[in-house]
Amino acid sequence: EMMKGMEAVDASLYNLLVYVDDASREGSQSYKFPTLYRLSKDKNGNVVKETVKEYKEQVSTDPAVMQEVLKRAFTEYPAESYGLVLWSHGEGWIPNPLPLAKQASTRWVGEDTTGGTTYLNISDIAAILSEFPRFDFILFDACFGQTVEVAYELRNCTDYVIGSPTEIPGPGAPYESVVPAMFKGTNVGVEIGKAYYEPYEKLYTGVSPSMTWTGGVAISVIDCAALDELASVTKQTIAKNELNVGEIYNYDLRSKYSKNYVGYYDMKQLMERLSSDVTAWTSAADTAIVY
């Protein structure tokens, strides 16, 4: 899909680098070492995949590994602007492991099963990205990637955060449409959000789950420039109140039958339950959520 999407991109002006570390085991027929690729075009205009760097087996969710891959990309392929896509499994905004009696595998994106299972926490991502130029966008092509907590933690690293507050369909982003949107000169965050959502909208029947992916997808785009104001207004509302979250819509149904999940609750509904006047909060939220 990425190579198909690259057909609509001027490869003489833009670089698309893809780091792949799949889940196949070393020794299996499908196994490949972690590899950084560049998608470009040959002299005939055909999209080709060239190897930038093949690594030895490594834990790709190790912050040092992510740091090295990004440093290589920035050094060897400098550009006027940058975007980042993080794709794998994802579990929201609370760190793994959670240092409480109720353990929860959350606040991470990325899963590496080399020698066990390890995850990359959002706080680690923020620390790594702070060393590099600010991104135009960060797209989480992973479940539960779009929460206000995640976006707030990354607000100094990127202009826009794009992702889903729910689980996403198995195929993930439709890169045939998303890749061209990534190289839009203006309003890139919203363009990516539309390019992710609209292909699923065309398939939507309301039936879920379905291997034809007719259950739809939830996607939003957050403008990080508006998050400090949203945080300020939110603090003014929640500082004086407590509420049973059992009354609030929970996007993660797993938390209802497993103590290993804490749930992801609808923020707008929460604020409406905490205050009879959410005019200021709604205005701040509408400014932050641009799609």
Residue ranges and their predicted role:
Residues 1-85, 90, 94-126, 247-291:
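Divalent cation-coordinating acidic motifs and surrounding scaffolds
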Residues 99-291:
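Terminal, contiguous helix-loop blocks that mediate binding/assembly
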